[in-house]
């Protein structure tokens, strides 16, 4: 089997390259590494390396700088978002505490109404006790008056009986 050679100027493949027969191996397919002998053959010029490095940097550096700037902007935006989120959380906590405060006010109104009712009851009881004390005082005064009248009545009766009892006549 023959290995095709390099294409001819008209683009048609010809036979094996010059100096190679059909059974020979093609160059580059040997058992040796493709890098062997390459280092000795190349003479590295510092200027060429520098120009290649500058070209590589000039090609990729703007994209890298834009990426770096975009990352910095994203980081700043993320910090702003975190601050905003913390503010919203604090607002939510304030709203939640406002709900607690509203519940406390509702409870305070409830207990205030209870206190008002208790105060009304106490005033009513105070009025009743005052009336009862006045009535008791009047009854006591009436009883004392009746007792005094009875005592006076007894004394009058005693005096009358004394006057009605026979008296020995005085000897004159």
Curated annotation (Swiss-Prot):
GO biological process, one term: endothelium development
Pfam families named among the record's database cross-references: Snapin_Pallidin
Signal peptide per UniProt: none
Domain of life: Eukaryota
Compartments where located: Cytoplasm; Membrane
Disulfide feature: none
Protein's membrane topology: Peripheral membrane protein
Record keywords, A-Z: Coiled coil, Cytoplasm, Membrane
Coiled coil location: 125-167
Coiled coil found in the keyword field: yes
Biased segments, Basic and acidic residues type: 143-164
Molecular function GO terms recorded: actin filament binding; molecular adaptor activity; protein homodimerization activity
Spans annotated as Disordered: 1-36, 135-172
Any GO CC annotation of this UniProt entry: SNARE complex
Family statement drawn from the similarity comment of this UniProt entry: Belongs to the BLOC1S6 family.
Subunit structure: Homodimer. Octamer composed of one copy each BLOC1S1, BLOC1S2, BLOC1S3, BLOC1S4, BLOC1S5, BLOC1S6, DTNBP1/BLOC1S7 and SNAPIN/BLOC1S8. The BLOC-1 complex associates with the AP-3 protein complex and membrane protein cargos. Interacts with BLOC1S4, BLOC1S5, DTNBP1/BLOC1S7, F-actin. Component of the biogenesis of lysosome-related organelles complex 1 (BLOC-1) composed of BLOC1S1, BLOC1S2, BLOC1S3, BLOC1S4, BLOC1S5, BLOC1S6, DTNBP1/BLOC1S7 and SNAPIN/BLOC1S8. Interacts with SNAP25, SNAP47 and STX12.
Role played: Component of the BLOC-1 complex, a complex that is required for normal biogenesis of lysosome-related organelles (LRO), such as platelet dense granules and melanosomes. In concert with the AP-3 complex, the BLOC-1 complex is required to target membrane protein cargos into vesicles assembled at cell bodies for delivery into neurites and nerve terminals. The BLOC-1 complex, in association with SNARE proteins, is also proposed to be involved in neurite extension. May play a role in intracellular vesicle trafficking, particularly in the vesicle-docking and fusion process.
Entry protein name: Biogenesis of lysosome-related organelles complex 1 subunit 6
Lineage: Eukaryota, Metazoa, Chordata, Craniata, Vertebrata
Gene encoding the protein: BLOC1S6
